[in-house]
């Protein structure tokens, strides 16, 4: 039985044509969905939007490795910010946080390979990977305490971090396993 991680045969941190192609597809999808949903804000937050498509970041990391996951999150969020706000790097730390979430989710198939022997176990692991990736990756936004100290700890915690990890964790826990269930038969047909 095969595993979902392309990192098993190519190396976890390999940057191959395949990784770049999958990352480009994922980043393009993520950017377009970011652009289409940026106006749907969670009330009482610091411009945190509802993003059910966040599961794309964790899926691409889980399915294609940590490099692809990072690129989908970072590039997709950067391009999405440019499309939505006209400023690709105005909040670069959010793009890095999105990338780190995909990277962390991409490490789970390496760490858990021996436990993912069935499609259902891979799907369940992908949900956990998505939630853990979100919680860990978005810790990076705390750099705002240095960059924008006027926001303060409480605003970052209650207006940004908690709403972001709640919304994105829900999306990752639902969307990532659905995409794993959809991708696995295609992957086997393609011989990937």
Residue ranges and their predicted role:
Residues 1-9, 185-192:
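Short, charged juxtamembrane terminal tails flanking transmembrane helices
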Residues 2-63, 67-68:
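Hydrophobic transmembrane alpha-helices
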Residues 26-34, 76, 80, 101, ...:
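Alpha-helical transmembrane segments of multipass membrane proteins
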Residues 38-54, 85-93, 111-192:
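Membrane-embedded alpha-helical hairpins and interfacial helices in multi-pass inner-membrane proteins
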Residues 42-43, 57-59, 73-77, 177:
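Re-entrant/interfacial helical elements at transmembrane boundaries that shape
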Residues 53-57, 97-102:
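Hydrophobic core segments of transmembrane alpha-helices in multi-pass, intramembrane catalytic enzymes
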Residues 64-65, 76-86:
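Interfacial segments of multi-pass membrane proteins
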Residues 69-78, 126-133:
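Central hydrophobic cores of alpha-helical transmembrane segments
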């Amino acid at each position: 039985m095969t595993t979902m991680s392309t990192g098993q045969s190519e190396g976890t941190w390999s940057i191959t044509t395949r990784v770049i192609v999958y990352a480009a597809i994922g980043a393009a999808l993520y950017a377009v969905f970011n652009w289409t949903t940026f106006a749907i804000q969670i009330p009482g937050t610091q411009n945190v939007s509802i993003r059910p498509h966040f599961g794309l970041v964790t899926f691409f990391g889980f399915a294609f490795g940590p490099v692809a996951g990072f690129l989908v999150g970072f590039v997709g969020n950067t391009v999405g910010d440019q499309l939505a706000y006209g400023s690709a790097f105005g909040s670069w730390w959010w793009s890095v946080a999105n990338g780190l979430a995909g990277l962390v989710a991409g490490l789970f198939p390496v760490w858990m390979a021996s436990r993912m022997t069935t499609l259902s176990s891979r799907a369940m692991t992908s949900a956990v990977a998505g939630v853990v990736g979100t919680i860990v990756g978005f810790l990076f936004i705390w750099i705002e305490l240095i960059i924008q100290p006027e926001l303060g700890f409480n605003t970052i915690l209650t207006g940004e971090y908690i709403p972001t990890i709640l919304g994105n964790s829900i999306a990752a826990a639902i969307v990532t396993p659905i995409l794993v269930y959809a991708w696995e038969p295609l992957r086997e047909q393609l011989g990937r």
